[in-house]
From Swiss-Prot:
It is a peripheral membrane protein. WD repeats lie at residues 74-107, 114-153, 158-194, 213-247, 253-285, 307-349, 357-391, 413-490, 518-629, 643-705, 832-889, 898-969, 974-1018, 1032-1055. The modification Phosphoserine is found at residues 574, 589, 593, 599, 763, 765-766, 771-772, 793, 800, 812, 820, 822-823. Belongs to the WD repeat L(2)GL family. It is found in: Cytoplasm; Cell membrane; Membrane. The gene is STXBP5L. Plays a role in vesicle trafficking and exocytosis inhibition. In pancreatic beta-cells, inhibits insulin secretion probably by interacting with and regulating STX1A and STX4, key t-SNARE proteins involved in the fusion of insulin granules to the plasma membrane. Also plays a role in neurotransmitter release by inhibiting basal acetylcholine release from axon terminals and by preventing synaptic fatigue upon repetitive stimulation. Promotes as well axonal outgrowth. One of its GO terms (biological process) is protein transport. Detected in kidney, hippocampus and lung carcinoma. This is Syntaxin-binding protein 5-like. Changing residue 1043 to I: Found in a family with autosomal recessive infantile-onset neurodegenerative disease; uncertain significance; loss of axonal outgrowth.
């Protein structure tokens, strides 16, 4: 007996009501509304045949790992026993690094900048001081660190912290010059305070300034060295509570470091000098040097230099000490880069850096400050890089960094993410890329080797591809939540280098970064790789293991089209689409080759933006350029940037489009098959009756005004924002911009995994793009999209001339954001936003599948173009390919973003592909060779009838059509108040689903083909442009986005991966015995000073020091224990962890009970003793003696 489905009854009732397919409302958060439609009787049959296995229990959103260099770093710390490194940032983030695979990200909820970090050495804890004057204690003994305690200072600002080795008391210096002491275990302030007016001499009337240094003496832990900004240093006796000695210097102090014997210390000053002080003669420096100052005549002071911001004085047992400092260069060398100076004996080595130095630390063999330090490396934290210098070799080489700290080497402009790739790809790419690695690194192992990490159970090959502003492409191995660079491709090598002065003549669309990558398409199976750049070019690459020297083939395409500005009908009104399959004339095919002619003073025509190399080029193994396609200038108009891209290795065809039209190129025969304006694709069935016209002279100016007036109501400072350069997205000052405004700024799209995902226009390719629109002379738009974006039309309108404030004001008018249908949406210019190759049904009456190209536009229109390929394999290299619009039209609300197809059983159909073969393998070329094309097995053996689903997603809704009948089976209005930025059809647990990322921050998952909502989570309440332009989904529940200019954030929407995440993360803390201190020897202990320890608890505890004022600091309990349980519960050891915590809590309560019992017994004994004494006292007295 067949199971009764009540939902189908409701769906049938819904279908019978008018407008049921598109009238569903949106939720309160601007998320999803839904409606289902099945107009034809066949739909109900198909729905019964498909058993959807996905349920909402399969989905959950969770951040997994963050890769890249910490954005805007501010602080650095190192645990010499655990060998882990911590980096704090200006945004309140902390990154903790260990061995490769051990990479943890933490975030302060307040978002305040991290001022300083201090490890509790070998105890699995970290103290952070933030700019909101709060101290935090982090527990590192769990995979997801959490805050245990916080201490908020209310009346003083924190400037410096110091935690002695194996001490439980933290010294905290403040801006007022006072020094407070905090108990690390309880995070409570001690009553012991060193006031600034008691530390300095009574005769001194001026304030010494903030505390810039605190450290205890290596010889005597009872003595504290306090450095003040104005040049005063105080040696404070903690026991006697008085200053033992004071040091005064004319120049401000930046840092201080001890000699390990505790008899001398070194200071760095603002005049570029280093002073060495001896405790026995504090009246003047024992030695004063200006390392980079010019030597003057006798009697004159050396020339002052730039401040030395930090100095470290490290001793060696068998060699001269190391003096390492940053800064201190001479002022006359203004052009010199930031440097780190290493002084070892008489040798002075200056290491120049590419970026300003934020902080550095010397790594030493021992954690004990009173032993020979034996430094072996220096960690240098730069503004945009992290390097480690090997001190054990005389030439001071750097270590090869195993972390992906160079993602931002050139600003990232687009990303692509591929999960479950062919397993041999990673090895192949690595073997090619390793040959091009830099040489000269240290041969020692990476010194930051702490923590523990294993692969985990859930591993499959994953590859991330990033496109960059300099035209480079990087392939990354992203398997097992790690990231390692495999291979780097430089696309700029196919072009001639621009000579000085040539840029304005031929490349006016972009002055800076003309090679910036917009879109990426990659077919892992065929290894075909294709990119489009900001200068309106497309390059097709083929992979080869052999080096070749050959000429680069190039084609030039004219793709410039204009129409009359006729107001279009409302997008909600779906016009009729007649079947024109029988009456369409043959398509117009334009020759793609043109002669490049340019002369000064003549209107530019048929000139590409870049010049392809004409001489033979040596191409190393890896990806080698097969064909370069460039759009050219037409009648003085620059080519529009490409907004959509798709490649089919099986068909040997590449298609791309922009706001003017569509171009289709045969990259096997190197010929242009189609170069047509968007209107011509409709032919006689143009729904909006637009007429072609010749290009107008002031087109760009009109477009500028037209778009500006619609945007001026959204943001008052729009003119300035629209003209921000492309680098504004990738600079370090990353200021969020409202996405609703961003919607109006980006007409192009982003593509991932062969499908498009973009805010307004999109194409079927695998990557994201940085879109077009030239603004005046500067035309560098942020990673992935152009400067503005239209909701329903004209997604690629150019902006080339500036708009004055008066013009902007005149053209502006008031309208609500909800009414997206306005004049800006009704322009007749229609951009190609999505492309997709698939074997499908081009027309209604087709009975067999054939090669097709699906074309989506910014007006929500979908056109199917039929591809007629030669039948015989040998003829494919000689016979022409016919390209013909089929006359089939489908419509949606909003710009089309992505396509996909499913078979009648609900299986996701993959486009056909050609099996990879090395094009330069001599052995294979000698044999008779035929192209081996892999077709989708399910699509190749289907019977006649409605047996293919086509999934189409736009900015507003998703629809599922049955082909060839073109019946709309399902429609889902995803959002009404917002719009979709990224969409992709992905595989999850062997089933297909539609994943969407909305401008309001919602991530939504829908099952296919029914489009039932599976997940709707408000993941990013405060989104910004960078996230919107780089967000991409892939299979197996994975996604990523560029969270900052230097970091990639990966997340999962898979419940299974969320459950197993704890097992995949690395351990930050591993049990290691603390090394024993060296034996000082009898004589050294006798004459070397009082090196014995003293009881800090007795000195700083409440019993002797009293309680601190409650108004001075506020203790805030942290969520560490709760977070620790949540983190442990996610792994296999969750139950054991909970049991252990319960036992610990029970043991703690029993311990407290035992203490109370012991206290009561003590009290009882005291009472008994007192009663006995009282009895003895009055035992022999008479009654009258009382």
């Amino acid at each position: 007996m067949k199971k009764f489905n009540f939902r189908k009854v409701l769906d049938g009732l819904t279908a019978s009501s008018p407008g049921s397919g598109s009238s569903s409302g949106s939720n309160s958060g601007g998320g999803a509304g839904s409606g289902s439609v099945h107009p034809a009787g066949t739909a109900g049959v198909l729905r019964e045949e498909i058993q959807e296995t996905l349920t909402s229990e399969y989905f959950q959103i969770c951040k997994t790992v963050r890769h890249g260099f910490p954005h805007q770093p501010t602080a650095l710390a190192f645990d010499p026993v655990q060998k882990i490194l911590a980096i704090g940032t200006r945004t309140g983030a902390i990154r903790i690094l260990g061995r490769p695979g051990v990479d943890c990200y933490c975030q302060h909820e307040s978002g305040a900048a991290v001022l300083q970090l201090q490890f509790l050495i070998n105890e699995g804890a970290l103290v952070s001081a933030s700019s909101d004057d709060t101290l935090h204690l982090w527990n590192l003994r769990q995979k997801r660190p959490a805050i245990l305690h916080s201490l908020k200072f209310n009346r003083e600002r924190i400037t410096y912290c110091h935690l002695p080795f194996q001490s439980k008391w933290l010294y905290v210096g403040t801006e007022r010059g006072n020094t407070h002491i905090v108990n690390i275990e309880s995070f409570i302030l001690s009553g012991y305070v060193i006031m600034w007016n008691k530390a300095i001499e009574l005769s001194t009337k001026t304030h010494p300034g903030p505390v810039v240094h605190l450290s205890d003496s290596p010889r005597d832990e009872g003595k504290l060295l306090i450095g003040y900004e104005n040049g005063t240093v105080v040696f404070w006796d903690l026991k006697s509570k008085r200053a033992e000695l004071r040091v005064y210097y004319d120049e401000a102090i930046h840092s201080i470091d001890w000699h390990h014997e505790g008899k001398q210390f070194m200071c760095s000053h603002s005049d570029g000098s280093l002073t060495l002080w001896n405790l026995k003669s504090p009246s003047r420096p024992f030695q004063t040097t200006i390392p980079h100052g010019k030597s003057q005549r006798e009697g004159r002071k050396s020339e002052s230099c730039k401040p030395i911001l930090k100095v470290e004085y490290k001793t060696c047992k068998n060699s001269e000490p190391f003096i390492i400092f940053s800064g201190g260069l001479s002022y006359d060398k203004a052009c010199r880069r930031p440097s780190l100076t290493i002084m070892h004996g008489k040798a002075i080595t200056v290491l120049e850096m590419d970026h300003p130095i934020v902080e550095f630390l010397t790594l030493c063999e021992t954690p004990y400050p009173n032993e020979f330090q034996e430094p072996y490396a220096v960690v240098v934290l730069l503004e945009k890089d992290l390097i480690v210098v090997d001190l054990t070799q005389s030439n001071f080489p750097i270590f090869e960094n195993p972390y992906p700290m160079d993602i931002h080497e050139s600003p990232v402009t687009c990303t692509a993410y591929f999960a479950d790739c062919p397993p041999d790809l990673i090895l192949v790419l690595y073997s090619i890329g390793v040959k091009h690695k830099k040489q000269g690194y240290s041969n020692k192992e990476w010194p930051i080797s702490g923590g523990a990490w294993n692969l985990g159970a859930q591993t499959y090959p994953e590859i991330i591809i990033t496109g960059h502003a300099d035209g480079s492409i990087k392939f990354w191995d992203a398997s097992a939540i790690t990231l390692q660079m495999l291979y780097k491709l430089k696309t700029s090598k196919v072009f001639e280098k621009q000579k000085v002065g040539e840029g304005k003549q031929t490349c006016e669309i972009v002055e800076e970064d003309p090679f910036a990558i917009q879109m990426i398409y990659w077919c892992p199976e065929s290894r075909i790789f294709c990119v489009s750049g900001v200068s309106a070019y497309v390059i097709i690459y083929k992979f080869s293991r052999h080096e070749i020297t050959t000429e680069i083939v190039s084609l030039e395409v004219r793709l410039q089209y204009d129409v009359e500005d006729i107001i279009t009908p409302e997008p909600e009104t779906s016009p009729p689409f007649p079947d024109l399959s029988a009456q369409l004339p043959s398509s117009r095919s334009l020759s793609g080759s043109t002669n490049t002619v340019a002369s000064e003073g003549v209107t530019k025509d048929s000139i590409p933006c870049l010049n392809v190399k004409t001489r033979p080029v040596r191409m190393p193994p890896g990806y080698q350029a097969e064909l370069v396609i460039q759009l050219v200038w037409v009648d003085g108009e620059p080519p529009q940037q490409i907004t959509s891209l798709a490649v089919s290795s099986a068909y040997g065809i590449v298609a791309f489009g922009n706001c003017n039209g569509l171009a289709v190129v045969d990259f096997i025969q190197k010929t242009v098959l189609l170069s047509m304006g968007t209107i011509d694709l409709y032919r006689s069935s143009d729904l909006y009756q637009r007429q072609p016209r010749s290009p107008r002279k002031n087109k760009q100016f009109i477009a500028d005004n037209f778009c500006m007036r619609g945007l001026s109501n959204f943001y008052p400072d729009l003119t300035k924002r629209i003209r921000t350069s492309y680098q504004s997205l990738t600079e370090l000052n990353d200021s969020p911009v409202p996405l609703e405004l961003e919607r109006c700024k980006s007409p192009t799209s982003d593509h991932v995994n062969g499908h498009c995902t973009s805010p307004t226009s999109q194409s079927c390719s695998s990557g994201k793009r940085l879109s077009s629109a030239d603004v005046s002379k500067v035309n560098r738009w942020g990673p992935g999209r152009p400067p503005f974006r239209k909701a329903q039309s004209a997604a690629c309108m150019e902006i080339s001339l500036p708009v004055t404030t008066e013009e902007n004001r005149e053209n502006s008018y008031n309208r609500s954001r909800s009414s997206s249908i306005s004049s800006i949406d009704k322009d007749s210019k229609e951009a190609i936003t999505a492309l997709y190759f698939m074997d499908s049904f081009a027309r209604k009456n087709d009975s067999t599948i054939s090669p097709c190209l699906f074309v989506g536009t910014s007006l929500g229109m979908v056109l199917i173009i039929s591809l007629n390929l030669p039948l015989a394999d040998e003829q494919r290299f000689t016979e022409p390919v016919m390209v013909l619009p089929s006359g089939t039209f489908l419509s949606l609300k909003g710009a089309v973003l992505t396509f996909s197809c499913m078979d009648r059983m609900g299986g996701l159909m993959q486009p056909p592909y050609e099996v990879w073969r090395d094009p330069n393998n001599i052995d294979e070329n000698e044999k008779s060779w035929r192209r081996k094309v892999v077709m989708n097995s399910s699509s190749a053996s289907q019977e006649i009838g409605d047996h293919q689903y086509t999934i189409i997603c736009s900015e507003k809704q998703a629809k599922v059509f049955s082909l060839p009948s073109q019946t709309c089976l399902y429609v889902h209005n995803i959002t009404e108040t917002s719009f979709i930025l990224q969409a992709n059809v992905v595989v999850m647990c062997s089933s297909a689903c539609l994943a969407c990322f909305c401008a309001n921050g919602h991530i939504m998952i829908m099952s296919l083909p029914s489009l039932r909502p599976m997940l709707d989570v408000n993941y990013l309440p405060l989104t910004d442009m960078r996230i919107a332009r780089t967000f991409c989904f892939t299979n197996e529940g994975q996604a990523l986005y560029l969270v900052s200019p230097t970091e990639i954030q990966r997340l999962t929407y898979s419940q299974e991966m969320c459950d197993n995440l704890q097992d995949m993360l690395g351990d930050l803390f591993t049990p290691i015995e603390t090394p024993e201190a060296q034996n000082r020897g009898f004589l050294k202990g006798l004459f070397g000073g009082s090196g014995q320890t003293f009881d800090r608890e007795e000195l700083f505890g409440e019993a002797s020091a009293g309680k601190a004022s409650r108004s001075l600091a506020q203790h805030i309990p942290g969520p560490g224990s709760i977070e620790g349980m949540k983190g442990a519960a996610g792994g296999v050891m969750g139950e054991l962890t909970r049991a252990r915590i319960a036992l610990d809590e029970r043991g703690q309560r029993l311990g407290e009970l035992e203490e109370k019992t012991a206290g009561m017994m003590t009290s009882a004994e005291a009472f008994s003793k007192h009663a006995h004494e009282l009895m003895l006292k009055y035992k022999d007295k008479k009654w009258y003696q009382f």
